[in-house]
Amino acid sequence: MLQQQKSIRGEKMNSKQKPDAVLDRMGPNSKGFTLVEIIVILAVISILVAILTPTVLKYIDEARGDRAGEDVKSISAMINDLIKDTGKYPGNKLESGNTFLCSTGNVGLSGQTWGTTANCEDLANHLVVNNPGDTASTGDNYPSTGKFRWKGPYITNLSEDPWGNGYQINASTLVGGNTSVTWVISAGPDGTFQTSVTSTSLSGDDLGVRIK
């Protein structure tokens, strides 16, 4: 019995000594990173960042371009649906003095002449709500009853392009019998319009789709 108790006490002492033994092994013989090692690690990280950053930025730019391309296609399709549903052209619904339909975002950009705050009408008033022509609820709305009527909202939210600028439509040409080109367009990454409102093809880094 006495021998068994000694054995138990011995085990307890050994269990108490284990952490100290571990600390002893980690103490004077253990080493952290030296200054040289830290400098080498930071240098490697810097090199990796320098290598990867252009690739990451390229993918980001491509993703933004893809989004803008899909946006102009979607807006064009929604405008065509609006015309088909109502039998009316947005160009005939513009408030006096307005010649462009613009989404949210910056307008009045440099380059070719497109819409400004003075002649841009909110595109959302045609696609999100049925209130074209002005900000009053009694404006020249699209028909709301009958076979040919406004069947929106065609989209719940119209945002700016990926670079913070508004999508634009030269809507004054979007009237019956007018054969002039009509664009849904973004000024692209540089925020400058290189495509004129009368051009039949895109220029520069502009992104757009012809409605007609």
Where are these regions (language model features)?
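N-terminal leader/signal peptides at the extreme start of proteins
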Residues: 1-33
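N-terminal single-pass transmembrane signal-anchor helix
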Residues: 29-60, 64, 75-76
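Short, glycine/small-hydrophobic-rich surface segments
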Residues: 79-154
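Intrinsically disordered, low-complexity regions enriched in Pro/Ser/Thr/Gly and acidic residues
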Residues: 144-176, 181
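Acidic, glycine-anchored loop motifs typical of Ca2+
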Residues: 162, 190-192
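Short, low-complexity, Pro/Ser/Thr/Gly-rich segments in the mature regions of secreted, periplasmic
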Residues: 203-212
